[in-house]
């Protein structure tokens, strides 16, 4: 067991880069305002540009609808819908890739016409973390999101969300957003205050965080382990509720105030799942049930979910999942149908990509458009390097290797009970840290009483899959996955096939 280490927070100003500031030429803005007014007038929907808000990627032109003379000689204000329908005509007149019309702008008596800038400016994480909008949030889980169209920094409190759903196509900035949120949290919390559970089926986005002391276990990349991860998180949530009841605490903040000085504080858990689509294709019913239960109940225990997907379809983001994730971020998507799946309204299909996003807050009636913060690979490397170096410096030269080994086999004392496992031939990072012996039928030595029956079953059917064992043996997902792993180790079945195809039975007696 590793000795307790007292960690120190980094100076984030030394680890992050400053953003670049690009001012839009005033003459260009005036010319675009003139074109907007002339175009509206030519379609019998006159309006006057009363406000111009240049942003890092787009500029918002605030248009106040004008009046038309009726046949009776009375003045009648132009309908907001008349302006909103002219988005394609305005884009043509302005020679813009696409424009988005917000009709009306919430809290203002004007219609917002959002036009892309000729040059794009990056929004740095450092600039948002130094802004008053970020610093005045009193929470350990405050996150920097980006700059709104009017140039206002946008930050949010993850504990208030309390979970976040992120969706967008490839190249839209979704993965950068996830990394920016993780980086922001790492810069504000020690491993005693915050721990991560990361799931990365694509094996490219989150594996770089392996080795930091904030991880409950190395990043999970084995698709067949992910349901077990969610089941473990659910058990941890229930364990925390029992601890709350024992001392009369209402939530994690109340618990940490009431415990004695010699007791370990309960850390926040943030579960990051990089691609929901892979999991929904593998075990849709179990995934939906677990995510819904965690989203409904985990907030008080300090467990928060951040889930992203590049396939925002109704079979991936189901109604039950969406109902329990009121905080959502939509990046550029392919169609208005996909936008409705995420936000319940169109608009995301008109975003520009590369960090252009719509943030739907639980408190807001309408989504807010903004340019998301950008965190480079070099900045992430400096942040993870800081924590790894501190672990080695304070824990000894072998601390990093010991941490990975202990985490992999579930033997680190993190203030929770982790089931003991036998060491198998599977990679250490994917050991069954997440499994419960009582649920899997394991006797503590790695033997399962159903193993022989499972082998006989797959040999008779000449195929093997987790869902097959679940149906035929009437067992849970985790136990079935362990039986499949055991048979693969023993050379009875082959490796996983593409998609959801069953495995091949390769050995007969």
What annotation goes with each model-predicted range?
Residues 1-155, 160-163, 190, 404-442, ...:
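Low-complexity, intrinsically disordered P/S/T-rich segments
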Residues 1-10, 58-60, 82, 89-93, ...:
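P-loop NTPase catalytic phosphate-binding loop
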Residues 16-23, 74, 217, 221, ...:
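Short coil/turn segments at secondary-structure junctions
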Residues 43, 240, 244-247, 390, ...:
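Solvent-exposed amphipathic alpha-helical surface segments
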Residues 67, 312-313, 471-476:
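Conserved short loop/turn motifs at secondary-structure junctions
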Residues 251-254, 432-433:
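A detector of tandemly repeated sequence units and domain arrays
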Residues 258-261:
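Conserved helix/coil segment N-terminal to the catalytic DExD/H
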Residues 264, 268, 280-282, 288-293, ...:
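Conserved P-loop NTPase motor module
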